[in-house]
Design a protein with these regions (language model features):
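Short, polar/acidic, helix-capping and beta-turn segments at strand->helix junctions
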Residues: 30-183
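Residue-level detector of alpha-helical secondary structure
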Residues: 5-8, 12
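Intrinsic-disorder-associated interaction segments
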Residues: 4-5, 27
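Generic N-terminal simple sequence motifs
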Residues: 9, 18-21, 42, 53
Length: 183
């Protein structure tokens, strides 16, 4: 519990460094401000990518949108390929996870029409293609987790898995899926 609290406090402190960011108490005035927050952070979302196989990019069920696994796809191309610890550095893997998170948000916006409808990032499932012996999967997926908290504040705190994989589609180093609650 103490480790989780320390991690949460670190992420929230980093997110709150910008004085215009809603505080970690879950400011109700956040509605209508997510696009403004993205601009404030200098973040531009990519276009939501179409599915490349026999699946859909998202499914809405009740008050949740389930986002299919997103890879580090940017400007029409895969941004990173290879295994972490070989062709991909830890820093590049963290950035790849961040790109995956941006693609998750692009899919959420396509599904919901407006990211202001998001009430909670419920869960991220992270997969890391890495060399044998690599164990820093949580550090890699923090690239996505940190971004969610930077954008959504306390609503961005989520459950998560971060696991290793012997390979991922298109040879990417990271793939992340998500469950997002909305109104």
């Amino acid at each position: 519990r103490e480790a989780y609290k320390a991690l949460k406090d670190r992420i929230l402190a980093r997110a709150a460094q910008n004085s215009n960011h809603p505080d970690k108490s879950g400011d109700k005035n956040m509605a209508g401000q997510i696009d403004a927050r993205l601009v404030e952070l200098g973040i531009e979302l990519p276009q939501a990518a179409a599915a490349v196989a026999n699946y859909v990019p998202y499914v809405i069920d009740g008050g949740q949108v389930w986002i299919a696994g997103q890879v580090p796809f940017w400007n029409g191309a895969v941004k990173y390929t290879g295994s972490v610890g070989d062709a991909v550095s830890l820093d590049d893997a963290i950035d790849a996870a961040r790109v995956c998170a941006l693609n998750i948000l692009a899919q959420a916006k396509a599904a919901l029409g407006d990211l202001d409808r998001v009430t909670r990032i419920v869960k991220l499932g992270g997969f890391v293609n890495a060399v044998p012996g690599f164990t820093d999967y949580p550090k890699v997926i923090n690239g996505a987790s940190d971004l969610m908290v930077e954008i959504f504040g306390d609503k961005g705190m989520h459950a998560r898995s971060a696991v290793g994989a012997a390979g991922l589609p298109l040879g990417v180093p990271v793939e992340i899926d998500a469950v997002i609650a909305f109104t």
